[in-house]
């Protein structure tokens, strides 16, 4: 994701200043104003206007619309917006994206098709990672100069290769249907991470159901679906520990031994258990113990998604091959 955004950023810086006058000149030569006027006032204008409204209201399902939505998320957070200055207590906080069910997303049950939830997830995750981890993404995409990740085979030089963010899996649980043209929100946040994967949880919620950061009354009835996704970060063939990126984004408090080196256990109880076995009062300061406590809590759910990688062993071609070959598929 970041490597693509970097290429787009460089292209925009070069082509952007030249593109605007070129577009304006082209519109002038083609008499665009007269064409627009004829569209809205000429014979057959009613059908054209109705068709335009339908297209605009369903634009997210048009060809290349998904590509635009994802790339727009990359550019807006990595190029246009100022980098955030969040502190570690914001690491597990959500971002929200808003959209609606289009006509082309509706299936024969007259509700949003289950398959279309995943396209929305791509967009929401892009906004979350692009916004929350923008500082780390910028640093690691220029790893040759920032030296954020060193080459394991030669620790004296930085790891080299194209940086990329790869989706490793998604699991979605559907709770309640979304009806045609119904508006809804996607609330995405970091759930947890391990040595390889960054886990993200997303909830599909009724638009306007959440007020002032508090759960609404009967909030379970406001959630239409919940999904967990996992990302892996790569520099060439090298897997980058998610904590490297999170720490470079200023979202991890200092931890004895460091976040990457400490792989098993905490050295002490994450809830600050006292010597008598009773939990000590939680510190008002967001320290590494609170971050680790939240990470481990989310990991209990994330590990279920990770365990699905073992399903590869369950592939069975059948004793005599498939029972049938059917299409169209």
Which residues are covered by each model-predicted region?
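HotDog/MaoC-like acyl-thioester-processing domains
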Residues: 5-82, 178-180, 189-329
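Long, low-complexity, serine/threonine- and charged-residue-rich intrinsically disordered N-terminal tails
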Residues: 83, 87-88
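Hydrophobic beta-strand-centered segment that forms part of the acyl-chain substrate-binding groove
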Residues: 26, 126-184, 190-192
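Conserved, ordered domain cores of eukaryotic regulatory proteins
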Residues: 102-143
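Fungal secretory targeting signals
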Residues: 1-3
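Short amphipathic
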Residues: 94-103
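Extracellular structured ligand-interaction cores
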Residues: 96, 169-171, 183-185, 197-199, ...
